[in-house]
């Protein structure tokens, strides 16, 4: 029954625009849980978490971003407000280089989502941004000298120089 319930839920989850990855999923009394490799604990499996976990695997496996350099839903204070960017990646020197904002697949990516991630970047000042609902991915390169943001086709591969 347990496996059947998990399988049914996964089948109902949207097929995302990412490669296929294997996840560790289990059922609690009330929820399905997915193991978060970055936070090293089980998290309630929501549609947004489904996207976030796919993106973590994508960044680690396809873009070579070390999971040890990722922070998920870290607290960030913007004026008097507490915010939580979905994923922040740091380079080997400990400087933030990338922010991702994840939305559930049924949520449209709008100007408001880009403004949300731009607010995070006022504090973190990273060169790369990504917004995704798992189906549509948008990548941006920030130029701090010209104070401009350019959409790019894809993220670079993580290197020691990144």
Region roles according to the model:
Residues 13-128, 135-162:
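A short, conserved, highly charged catalytic patch centered on acidic carboxylates
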Residues 1-3, 47:
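Intrinsically disordered regions, especially transient/low-confidence alpha-helical propensity segments
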């Amino acid at each position: 029954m347990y496996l059947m319930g998990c399988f049914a839920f996964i089948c109902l989850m949207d097929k995302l625009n990412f490669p296929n990855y294997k996840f560790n999923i289990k059922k609690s009394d009330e929820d399905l849980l997915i193991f978060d490799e970055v936070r090293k604990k089980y998290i309630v499996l929501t549609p947004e978490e489904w996207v976030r976990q796919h993106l973590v695997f994508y960044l680690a496996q396809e873009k070579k971003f070390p999971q040890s350099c990722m922070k998920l839903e870290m607290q960030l204070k913007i004026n008097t407000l507490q915010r939580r960017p979905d994923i922040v990646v740091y380079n080997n020197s400990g400087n933030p280089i990338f922010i991702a904002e994840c939305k559930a697949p049924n949520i449209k990516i709008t100007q408001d989502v880009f403004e949300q991630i731009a607010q995070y970047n006022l504090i973190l000042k990273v060169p790369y941004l990504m917004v995704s609902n798992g189906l549509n991915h948008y990548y941006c390169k920030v130029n701090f000298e010209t104070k401009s943001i350019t959409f790019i086709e894809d993220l670079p591969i993580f290197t020691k120089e990144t």
